[in-house]
Design a protein with these regions (language model features):
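Predominantly a Rossmann-like dinucleotide-binding segment in NAD(P)-dependent oxidoreductases
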Residues: 130-210, 326
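Hydrophobic residues in well-ordered beta-strands that form the structural core
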Residues: 60, 98-99, 124-126, 256
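Haloarchaeal acidic low-complexity proteome signature biased toward cell-envelope/secretome components but also
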Residues: 1-9, 16-19, 30, 106, ...
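Beta-loop-alpha module in the N-terminal Rossmann-like domain of NAD(P)-dependent dehydrogenases
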Residues: 21, 57-116
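N-terminal Rossmann-like dinucleotide-binding module
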Residues: 1-52
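C-terminal helix-rich "cap/oligomerization" subdomain common to oxidoreductases
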Residues: 1-3, 42, 64, 73-75, ...
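NAD(P)-dinucleotide binding in Rossmann-like oxidoreductases
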Residues: 213-215, 225-287
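Basic phosphate/pyrophosphate-binding loop/patch that engages nucleotide-derived ligands
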Residues: 115-123, 134-150, 222-224, 249
Length: 334
């Protein structure tokens, strides 16, 4: 940081994440966007105008930005398969890193980043926003002392029609399909909320391409270390967004439900089948930039860590392998 305590952030990519989270850094009193790397000239200029970045700090190559600018942190908001190289480059330059999900689309890459960060004083936060959502925080607290043993989770979206011509349906950039995109948030939500360690995965997928790389629908069965199971369903070929997660233990359940991207509702169910709706103040939710800056200042773990993201990549990669082979796939995180 500068002497004034301002975090100098360089943006890599100015798509949705780059502009939204970049805007959070721009608006925060303790951070500023000082440089931008974007291959699209029009988007680069638009972002520069929005964030008041001078021409001499605009780049079409992120490596040139890292070499040429005095930065404290980078925001990686590029297509999924590019994350690994850009994250590693940022760490090599001694920077803190905010990376959109997923952390990586290769399990060995995710392991490498996790090992690297956990042995350093650099902060890496992954953009899984459920970790900041009071509904999911409430559910996670419910299972701190009694782990769930039966989980169901599903999310639907008009993903295929919406992104048919976008990088998200190009597996060379996305790493896969619906499961690696919107589905990644669902997997992260159930893994983080439950606190369980996955051990094996079985999956069946419907692919939208002849090469069987871009899934439009997936059914994923997960086994956990404590014997619990999860049944996860994602569909990107339906008309709207709905999300439902149900986690059961011997005392009852927690249900998290919502539509589109509005705040989620959490409901607790006791052993007598009585529903309770705990008070959840969504106004207290901090944004991603705020959480990232706080973690750096306090030298504390960010809300969504590299190890959290490693679990998601492990389950996701196992699901694709299982869908292609028809076999259960064991998961090894280390």
């Amino acid at each position: 940081m500068t002497r004034e305590g301002t975090l100098r952030v360089g943006l890599i990519g100015t798509g949705y994440i780059g502009t939204v989270v970049g805007g959070q850094f721009h608006d925060h009193p303790k951070s500023t966007v000082t440089a931008i790397a974007e291959i699209d000239a029009e988007r680069r200029e638009t972002a520069a105008d929005t964030f008041s970045v001078p021409d001499e700090s605009l780049y079409d190559d992120y490596k040139a930005m890292l070499d040429g600018e005095s930065l404290d942190a980078i925001l990686v908001g590029t297509p999924h398969t590019l994350h690994y190289e850009q994250v590693i480059s940022g760490l090599d330059h001694g920077l803190h890193v905010f990376c959109d999900k997923p952390l990586a689309t290769d399990l060995d890459h995710a392991r490498e980043i996790t090992d690297r960060v956990e042995g350093s004083d650099q902060t890496l936060m992954v953009g899984y926003q459920r970790h900041l959502n009071p509904a999911f925080i409430s559910a996670r607290e419910r299972f701190q002392d009694s782990k769930p043993r039966w989980i169901t989770a599903e999310i639907t979206q008009n993903w295929l029609s919406r992104f048919s011509d976008a990088w998200r349906t190009n597996p060379d950039l996305s790493g896969g399909g619906m499961l690696y995109d919107t589905g990644s948030h669902l997997l992260d939500a159930l893994l983080w909320t439950s606190g369980l360690e996955p051990t094996a995965v079985s999956s069946r997928m419907t692919f939208a391409d002849d090469d069987r790389r871009v899934d439009s629908e997936a059914v994923v069965l997960i086994e956990f270390e404590n014997g619990a199971t999860a049944n996860v369903t994602v569909s990107g070929d339906l008309p709207c967004v709905r999300e439902h997660i149900h986690l059961w233990d011997d005392d009852g359940a927690v249900s998290i439900d919502g539509r589109q991207w509005e705040p989620r509702m959490v409901t607790e169910i006791d052993s007598e089948n009585t529903e309770h709706v705990p008070y959840v103040d969504h106004e207290e939710q901090v944004n991603k930039a705020e959480a990232f800056i706080t973690a750096i200042e306090n030298e504390s773990k960010p809300p969504a860590t590299a190890r959290d993201a490693l679990r998601v990549t492990a389950v996701t990669e196992a699901a694709y392998e299982s869908a292609r082979t028809g076999e259960w796939v064991d998961i090894t995180l280390d």
